Amino acid sequence: MIKYDKLWITLKKKNISQYKLIKYYGVDKAQLQRLRNNEIVKTLIINRLCNILDCNVEDIMEYVPDEKISKS
């Protein structure tokens, strides 16, 4: 699973609010909602956030392995 928990930490460190992302950088509210819910997001959005925040992809997202499903 891809998780975007690091995005919110990076936003805080860079002193950029969600309001600012929407108002000044044109990030769609629906995209932010998808990120909040760890849902599918286009790589274009990830690239854009990295440019806005001047950061690397690992600063806004991480891979967390899904729990293995045991076959019984």
What are the residue ranges of the model-derived segments?
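Short alpha-helical DNA-recognition segment
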Residues: N15-Q33
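Short, basic-rich loop-to-helix N-cap that marks the start of a DNA-contacting helix
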Residues: N38-N51
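A short, Lys/Arg-rich alpha-helix, primarily the initiator
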Residues: M1-K20
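Short, charged recognition helix plus adjacent turn
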Residues: I9, M61-S72
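Residue-level detection of the helix-turn-helix DNA-binding "recognition helix"
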Residues: K12, G26, N37, P65
